[in-house]
């Protein structure tokens, strides 16, 4: 599956749209000539293109009208029970069930496994996959497309590919929506899709199956509130992540900060260098955030009123810390009594993300020899599980499937910031205790397959000693 399909945005020239009142109110637009649909490469240094629409275009009204249209579905097609039975056969694990029924700890030979008390498929992911499966059953003869990977897990994405659900192709860094025809069905993934892509699909009159996680749409509602109150959205996330791209498309003015270091820089700029001295000139600011700000962003004018939002898969504690920093920054600049006019906050932290992070914080306090973190290598929430374990100094191995283990006692894994590492003899000799967790997009069966590989290595070790 091409990496270039991630982080997609539309670039639309303003002259390609004209007014049409019946679609989304007085500010609606209709297409007059061909769209140029660009996709970023996923490169950290690549720009994240944005749609250029009339200033009167109301994304909230458009989305509301879209959800009420006959060609839109976000609740499935009445095949939930049989679909969940199929998913249960494909994705569940007897080993993990044994762990859960035995207090999340169990031993197989020389291997004791301690399982995090919250792990794996979250409700939003299970719902997205279920609806995608239902769509295939509901439309057995139609061509099914998806605007991006349904979730960040190679096993699930391959399964949908086998079901003939195709990802919109990319040529010359451009997403080719021209392949989509009127009678086709297009699935929006769990991360959501930008309002620009929704507009194009609605314009084509295709059947839209929306699997966007409700927690993601909650963030969209938050940035729309920021926009209504003329607050700039400070989005804690990765500017080239699909979810953040979609969220930004619903915002007014925005800036995306990846971590506390970038948040400190922004707050130092707001305070004129009186926070920690990390910021510099306006020109340097604009260069630093050139791929992470809204069109026409001016830090001197657009950081007077700010609201916090987040990519739902980021570290909960860091999002909260950034929010507190922004609030205290506004207190320092404008006075405690005036802070409500300069800072606004709504809780947009995903319960599932929080639960999985809390569970691994608990697990790293256990006595374990190593941590096995299972999840897609492009999964943001899984990277943070790895980060938490690494920070505690535990040997931690982030793999996306059992294929990363072997031959023999060897593993290929990623560190939380993405570096690929290979290690020989990663399993210590003798009895071992391993911690196990998995990202919110990871089926239990993938974790089981990895554990079976571990058991096989330790079993071979015992046979050699016999």
Swiss-Prot record:
Example GO biological process: isopentenyl diphosphate biosynthetic process, methylerythritol 4-phosphate pathway
Transit peptide as recorded in UniProt: 1-38
Q: Which residues bind [4Fe-4S] cluster?
A: 122, 213, 350
Which reaction is catalysed here?
A: isopentenyl diphosphate + 2 oxidized [2Fe-2S]-[ferredoxin] + H2O = (2E)-4-hydroxy-3-methylbut-2-enyl diphosphate + 2 reduced [2Fe-2S]-[ferredoxin] + 2 H(+); dimethylallyl diphosphate + 2 oxidized [2Fe-2S]-[ferredoxin] + H2O = (2E)-4-hydroxy-3-methylbut-2-enyl diphosphate + 2 reduced [2Fe-2S]-[ferredoxin] + 2 H(+)
Q: In which tissues is it expressed?
A: Expressed in roots, stems, leaves, flowers and siliques.
Its GO CC terms? chloroplast; chloroplast stroma; plasma membrane
Does the record bear Metal-binding in its keywords? yes
* HAMAP family referenced in this protein's UniProt entry, alphabetically: IspH (MF_00191)
Q: Which domain of life is it from?
A: Eukaryota
Family of this protein? Belongs to the IspH family.
Which class of enzymes does this protein belong to? oxidoreductase
* Catalytic site positions: 243
Q: Keyword Plastid, does the record have it?
A: yes
The molecular function GO annotations come to:
4 iron, 4 sulfur cluster binding; 4-hydroxy-3-methylbut-2-en-1-yl diphosphate synthase activity (ferredoxin); 4-hydroxy-3-methylbut-2-enyl diphosphate reductase activity; metal ion binding
Q: Which residues bind (2E)-4-hydroxy-3-methylbut-2-enyl diphosphate?
A: 152, 241, 312, 379-381, 441
| Record-given protein name | 4-hydroxy-3-methylbut-2-enyl diphosphate reductase, chloroplastic
